[in-house]
């Protein structure tokens, strides 16, 4: 599953009706989506605006209205559907889908997301979706099967529970904090190590020459500073002033 998003939100409302009417998810179908929100109002329909260009969709449990203004070539095998199809090959059952030929985006406007059973047999079973999200508040996957337990890792089958998702913003903040601590650690390490080396080295070399002791001490600081700057640049992608190291 591929998720591309710069602003993933995980504060999923815990209401009984899972009211997500004001939430929008832009989804591009390419791989299976193991993401479902289970709600108590199981009879509430899921209305999906599917904006795709010439897609082959195999769907179950949906009422489909396909409104693509291209060609009128239809190969349809439908059961219990309301279908207006143009230029699509569809196998559909009881889905509410509107295909409007707009940039392969699906806008979810619904009271709840399809349960796992509907996911396996419905819109996601054969169309292999990959998700590209602008807003994302649906991350509550329930385990299934006798051996599945809530919160116990990632089973090989899609049903699972993810109670918390570290989004890109949170991860970015974490990495900045980590890098800051990492930098301070290296700063302290190099300051202490090379300071000690700069003091001890002249003691041993002063027997030969005071000049060499001074050169050696300064050289140790310079080498340490260069090494630290290189390490920091590799990690953070930016340079650190040598004066900050000393």
Curated annotation (Swiss-Prot):
The lineage of its organism: Eukaryota, Amoebozoa, Evosea, Eumycetozoa, Dictyostelia. It comes from the Eukaryota. The chain crosses the membrane at residues 185-205, 208-228. The keyword Acetylation does not apply. InterPro entries: Golvesin-related_Golgi. It is found in: Membrane. Disulfide bonds: none annotated. Keywords: Membrane, Transmembrane, Transmembrane helix. Residues 47-100 have a biased composition (Low complexity). The keyword Transmembrane helix applies. GO terms for cellular component: membrane. Residues 46-100 are annotated as: Disordered. This is Putative uncharacterized transmembrane protein DDB_G0292500. It is a multi-pass membrane protein.
């Amino acid at each position: 599953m591929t998720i591309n998003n710069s602003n993933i939100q995980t504060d999923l409302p815990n209401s009984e009706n899972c009211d997500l009417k004001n939430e929008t998810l832009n989804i591009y179908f390419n791989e299976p989506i193991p993401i479902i929100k289970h709600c108590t109002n199981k009879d509430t329909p899921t209305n999906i605006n599917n904006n795709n260009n010439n897609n082959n969709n195999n769907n179950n449990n949906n009422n489909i209205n396909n409104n693509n203004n291209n060609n009128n070539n239809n190969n349809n095998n439908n059961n219990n559907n309301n279908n207006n199809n143009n230029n699509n090959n569809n196998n559909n059952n009881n889905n509410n889908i509107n295909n409007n030929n707009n940039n392969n985006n699906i806008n979810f406007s619904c009271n709840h997301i399809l349960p796992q059973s509907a996911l396996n047999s419905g819109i996601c079973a054969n169309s292999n979706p990959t998700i590209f999200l602008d807003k994302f508040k649906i991350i509550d996957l329930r385990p299934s099967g006798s051996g599945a337990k809530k919160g116990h890792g990632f089973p090989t089958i899609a049903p699972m529970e993810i109670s918390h998702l570290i989004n890109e913003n949170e991860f970015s903040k974490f990495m900045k904090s980590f890098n800051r601590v990492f930098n301070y650690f290296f700063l302290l390490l190099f300051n202490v190590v090379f300071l000690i080396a700069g003091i001890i080295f002249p003691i041993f070399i002063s027997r030969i020459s005071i000049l060499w002791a001074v050169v050696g001490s300064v050289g140790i600081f310079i080498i340490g500073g260069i090494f630290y700057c290189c390490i920091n640049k590799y990690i953070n992608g930016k340079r650190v002033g040598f004066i900050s190291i000393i």
